[in-house]
């Protein structure tokens, strides 16, 4: 930061990662728009996203049976999951799902051991995995990374929702 200060380059904090709602996170597009001289376009784009999001959210708001979902995966000896008050938890709820960590008070990531996730997520209907996998991702690749993954109901029923960050610029 010192070099940037010496060159009189202003630093602007980017706090999007602190957002606890998907729309709050998406609204940061307005800040990006300001920096590149496209504030009006960014505001229009956000308004469209907000309208579509709220329309889809309303469609599932009265759903009685909500599919269960768990999230994350093991990295070394730790399973990383979004906290129960994170924007991912809100996204799952707004999409009509019952997130396995919904009662957790954390807004960021939570570190868990395999046994705890297994006990809570074993029978979940869906499993969300997001990582940067080189190559073509498959159930076999997921199983190869940890053979115990094949025991989860969502794996057995082929209901893993996968986002490859190598292909999709989510962040």
Task: Please report, for each region that a protein language model flagged, where it lies by residue.
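Loop/turn elements at helix/coil->beta-strand transitions in domains of secreted/extracellular proteins
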Residues: 7-12, 32, 63-69, 95-98, ...
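Loop/turn-rich, solvent-exposed surfaces of beta-rich toroidal or solenoidal domains
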Residues: 70-74, 114, 124-135, 139
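His/Asp/Glu-enriched short active-site or ligand-binding loop at hydrolase and phosphoryl-transfer sites
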Residues: 88-108, 128-131, 162
């Amino acid at each position: 930061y010192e070099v940037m200060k010496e060159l009189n380059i202003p630093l602007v904090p980017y706090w999007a990662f602190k957002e606890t709602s998907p729309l709050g996170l998406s609204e940061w597009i307005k800040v990006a728009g300001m920096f590149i001289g496209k504030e009006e376009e960014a505001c229009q784009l956000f308004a469209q996203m907000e309208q579509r999001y709220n329309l889809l959210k309303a469609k599932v708001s009265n759903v009685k049976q909500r599919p269960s979902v768990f999230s994350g995966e093991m990295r070394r000896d730790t399973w990383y999951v979004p906290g129960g008050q994170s924007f991912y938890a809100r996204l799952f709820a707004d999409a009509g799902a019952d997130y396995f960590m919904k009662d957790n008070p954390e807004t960021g990531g939570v570190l868990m051991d395999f046994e705890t996730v297994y006990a809570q997520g074993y029978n979940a209907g869906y499993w969300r995995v997001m990582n940067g996998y080189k190559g073509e991702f498959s159930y076999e690749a997921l199983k190869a990374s940890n053979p115990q993954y094949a025991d989860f109901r969502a794996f057995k029923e082929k209901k893993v929702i996968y986002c490859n960050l190598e292909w999709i610029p989510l962040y």
